Amino acid sequence: ITAEDIKTGPVQQTYLNGDVTPYELYIKMLMEYFSDRVLATDAQDAFDMPEGYDKYEYQTDAVIEGYKKLLKYDGFFLADVVGLGKTVIATMIAKQFCIDNGYENTKILVVYPPAVEHNWKQTFKDFGLDKYTRFISNGSLSKVLDEENYDYWNADEYDLVLVDEAHKFRTHTNTAFTELQEICKMPRVETGNIPGFKKKVILISATPMNNTPADLYNEILLFQD
């Protein structure tokens, strides 16, 4: 092909020859940067709220953004302030994960402080996820690592781990951190529709950094090398 061919050939008939208006350029930019958010809203099942729950736009936005980060980085911080419904947001993200990975392919572990045990169990039940979930208080993680404890699936069977009040695991030298890190970083023994053997981790906290940036670093080590 020669330069003359380009000038006289069929390439001249493409849209590239036309003038692009500022408006068209703006729309193209929006699609490039935000198309994943637009498409994500089509997955309505995750946003179907059970009776007694209200749907808020900020929660829907948080689910879309959080889920995108979960798939891209294998984990993320859900760090809204107190009272904005982090439990519901995390549950909706877990539901979207189940939809995409396949419910029967998915096992979830929720790690929580004892004071909020009922809240987590009730919310997961309301959203229809309790069948695919085990719940453990943040001081009893050794039970998950005990292969003879049949109240829990083996640690390598979990696909998604949710950690409430994740700032309690900011110290990498204590036993609880070591146990949680082992659970989170133990490869999935089987995968569902979502590929990859790394577990997905959601760290939930209103105060992810209590003292120094080292707090964040240690918590990130729960899902990153």
What is each model feature region?
Residues 81, 113, 207:
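P-loop (Walker A) phosphate-binding loop of NTP-binding proteins
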Residues 1, 169-170, 207:
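Conserved RecA-like P-loop NTPase helicase motor core
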Residues 216-224:
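A short helix-turn-beta junction within AAA+ P-loop NTPase domains corresponding to the substrate/partner-engaging
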Residues 43-54, 64, 86-193, 225:
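SF2 helicase/translocase NTPase motor core
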